[in-house]
Amino acid sequence: MGNFHTMLDALLEDQEEAVLATIVQVEGSAYRKAGASMLFKKKGRRIGLLSGGCVEEDVFQRISALGDQLTSTLIPYDMRSEDDLSWGMGAGCNGIIHVHAERITQEKRRHYEKVRDCLHSGKAVTSVIKIESSHYLFLTENGHFGNWPDAPLQDIQRTVSTLHLPHFDQTTNMFIQRIEPKPRLILFGAGPDNVPLANLAADTGFSVIVTDWRPAYCTSSLFPKADQLITAFPEQMLSEFQFFPHDAAVVATHHYQHDQTIINFLFSQNLHYIGLLGSANRTKRLLSGKHPPSHFYSPVGLKIGAEGPEEIAVSVVAEIIQTRKRVAVV
């Protein structure tokens, strides 16, 4: 779902006709997993990837050939052969991918606007699609909406609560996936050494929020990829800002008292990642004997021997992604 938010913005920025292609099932191994999507807009713009470049053109040709007749269709691609004439293009992906292509109707576009509103408010949405039909449903914590009045809600909710998502049920031809809010990185400190971190985080799919008390530092010219800039002292910012459980925060103000104030406050919040820039000795003094939560990381970043702002940015973003995916580094 890493590029879903970009596709959603591209879909809703105008009324241009579009087709959404989504991998609903992978048998064996493949370049992308189930849930990966690609948006094809009528004027030729494409957002996202379904593979390493093996199937995208064929998907485009198929949906172009169907034209206005396309509503919803399932396309299988056998990537197992290493023959250059096959879909594997010699890559030996060793898997079969099933791609669902659907034309986005005006009704569904309006429902996607509701989806975006939910995501922007920090709430996840579960998407349910009846393959090879025009039926779909979106589930939220407050209810559901869509064009499927007789949807088997109990069966769907049972699947959502018991199975790992995304999930494709071949018996019912339903594809269910959970759409998470765009992960946010709140970066405390707008020093020039934090610019590479903000840029890399934005490039890898994070909504970046930079906050600093110095107006000369907290500017769009220094942080062009930041979604939000907050110029305020830590006490004011922390009292007014709404944090979400999927947020990651990196504290790098280089100001001892400010860092201590921020860290003490963040420890009381339900965040998935808190990182502190600085040496182990400085961190020990900042904590003043407090026992940090398990999602606190300092020195911040994976231990890759990073030097300089650019390499440190790589290590920090990699560590945040690792915690989100819950993958151990061997």
UniProtKB/Swiss-Prot annotation:
Assembly behavior: Could be composed of four subunits: PucA, PucC, PucD and PucE.
Organism lineage string: Bacteria, Bacillati, Bacillota, Bacilli, Bacillales
Full protein name: Probable xanthine dehydrogenase subunit A
Pathway the protein contributes to: Purine metabolism; hypoxanthine degradation; urate from hypoxanthine: step 1/2; Purine metabolism; hypoxanthine degradation; urate from hypoxanthine: step 2/2
EC number, as in UniProt: 1.17.1.4
Catalyzed reactions: xanthine + NAD(+) + H2O = urate + NADH + H(+); hypoxanthine + NAD(+) + H2O = xanthine + NADH + H(+)
Role: Oxidizes hypoxanthine and xanthine to uric acid. PucA subunit could exert a molybdenum cofactor recruiting function.
Domain of life per record: Bacteria
Gene Ontology terms: biological process: hypoxanthine catabolic process
Induction comment: Expression is very low in excess nitrogen (glutamate plus ammonia) and is induced during limiting-nitrogen conditions (glutamate). Expression decreases when allantoin is added during limiting-nitrogen conditions.
Keywords assigned: NAD, Oxidoreductase, Purine metabolism
Molecular-function GO terms, alphabetical: xanthine dehydrogenase activity
